[in-house]
Amino acid sequence: MNDKIFYNLSGKTLVSTPYVITKGIYHKSLIYMLSHTEEGAIGLMFNRLVNHIDLKSFFKIKNDEIVNPVMVPIYLGGPVEHEKGFFLHSTDYNKNLLLDFHNDLAVSSNLEISEDIAFGKGPKNSLLIVGYTGWKAGQLEKELEENLWLVMDCDKEFIFADNPENKWHNALKHLGIDEAHFSSQVGSA
């Protein structure tokens, strides 16, 4: 019999603790949780700026009305399926949504949103994210027990804020945590 209580973290933000391997992909990362069930979890990192790309070239938009390049930042969402692109965006845009959440965020993964963004008709706020982060059943729960992640309520202004390199430090401040208070030793007493 399993007496553990399952807490659904869909729509929450995971904040990596300093116990996550330094130099690893998840070091100082923030992940918006798309789905969390007893079967596993999926999320998108939103503070790993990779590059800036031209939407027209990246999505092979065949529209002659878009003359100038439309440069947008591109973020690494995680180590799974880098060939897949997702837009994490505000819900003022609601065409062909992949996922729609109650906290004013949505996810789209289609050519139409990239064209609408290029024409200035897209969502007010959006992040282009490639790849995602996934956990199999019980894996995220184990990582939470090992103090690898902190859980924070979603804040869309925080997600879409500029300066991705400062978001992790700002998340700790938001949670009232001073990074210096983390022990350099991993484990439990």
UniProtKB/Swiss-Prot annotation:
InterPro entries: AlgH-like. NCBIfam families: PRK00228.1-4 (NF001268). SUPFAM superfamilies: VC0467-like. It comes from Rickettsia bellii (strain OSU 85-389). Belongs to the UPF0301 (AlgH) family. Signal peptide: none annotated. GO terms for cellular component: cytosol. This is UPF0301 protein A1I_00140.
